[in-house]
């Protein structure tokens, strides 16, 4: 299917007064405490990961006040510390930050909402002192790990060009020794697709049984994915088929995020009408200066000729609700909504996808107001074909 791309259209007067009652609820707040990362992964989308910008502790009160005052914060949520390498902000920063956030929760959390903390980290800095902090609060740690060293170290290198696999595994050992809740996100590149058995056995042998696969994406400063080549779609399908075989017979249970999400939709007969990445204020991202955005977290640090940056406001001067009437928000929301509607009208997979992620549409097609992407073909369509085919075969329907 060819992507349907339209040029960005002027905002219609009829959408000037945006109905915000269907926005949210906010279930994920991503706080970017530092732009700096101690790795230099070659597929990273972030342009400023060499800069050592840090979130001042004084900004935490207006951040938490904005979160709890928002009309979109009506249910429990997670505070995810992400972008750059969040642990590079330092252990003492989080000791003070978590204590302050508890205080601000008591002051501003009038709805008595429950929230927890999570990190997405490369794991390199984790030691016993970090684990002591993680045990003090309800913390989940996501680790970026691409499988065995020969795959991981090809792309995830230090700033001096050395592989980071051994250091990441040391961090994981600390988490496991302390029974800290953790999971893995693995980026699949062209090379990964030849090694489903090796990746599966590596994770299983190291008791890493909760894994999500991210495709290497065309996004931000990563202007070309290694998966965007002839033949990789078929290789990816073969990878998924083999991984399904391996996980479906695994003891102990091995959970793959992509399989789990699709199976849940099939078993419950639910279908998606949207995703958190195209529904305003389901996700809120806040950077080290208090600037905030919504939709895809990847958009916050990016500047583009078409839209400028994706900063909608700042917690020091704006509420989440107030920016919904600004021209910038309405222009992006309009294009995002039009793209989702086109997906609804043209794609058989819409109920499994909900209209996709705007960042993928923008970076691949040049507009939010567009449809199918490479990311969609890999992440949704191929997974659906493999899982549905395997389930039908198991039921004798194939």
From Swiss-Prot:
Keywords: 4Fe-4S, Iron, Iron-sulfur, Metal-binding, S-adenosyl-L-methionine. It comes from the Bacteria. InterPro entries: Aldolase_TIM, rSAM, rSAM_SPASM_GrrM_OscB, Sulphatase_maturase_rSAM. The keyword ATP-binding does not apply. PROSITE patterns: RADICAL_SAM. The keyword Chloroplast does not apply. Its cofactor is [4Fe-4S] cluster. GO terms for molecular function: 4 iron, 4 sulfur cluster binding; metal ion binding; oxidoreductase activity. SUPFAM superfamilies: Radical SAM enzymes (SSF102114). Residues 21-253 form the Radical SAM core domain. [4Fe-4S] cluster binds at residues 37, 41, 44. Belongs to the radical SAM superfamily. Anaerobic sulfatase-maturating enzyme family. This is Uncharacterized protein sll1766. It comes from Synechocystis sp. (strain ATCC 27184 / PCC 6803 / Kazusa).
